[in-house]
Amino acid sequence: MHWGFVLLFVYGLLKQIDSLNQLEDSSLLKFEVVFASVFLFLLLIRFIYMKTTQQSSLPESTPKPQIMAAKITHNGMYICLALIPLTGLLIGLLFWLGLKEGLLTNLVVGAHELSVSIIYWLIGLHILAAVYHRLKNDGVWSSMVPFWKEK
């Protein structure tokens, strides 16, 4: 499930639009709405699944600040992963309503861009933490990555 989301997110990045004017193509606008809606639905399912069935793989000896950093990073990733399609849907709605420019559109576009920027940093931090745990050989890596398992 984790790696499926990685692929879905990367696809979303690769197919992103370069300009709001591209949304004048109604088939592209519809595709963006469907993609964002499906992404949000799958994100919600994943969030519920993870919160109800999974426990942290951090060892009990993990320092409290590190546990807090992991929680902040994970929750921040979920928030950004939700905000990106939500703000994208709002951009599409505003565009569809004819509000292609103006303060409201600029605010929503700014929130969208900020969410994307923050998720890049959080993903980087997530990867650094995974590598740290791989080097530490404490079992966390093996719970995150399907290859190069710890012994």
Locate predicted features.
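Membrane-embedded alpha-helical bundles that constitute the cytochrome b-like, heme-associated redox core
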Residues: 1-151
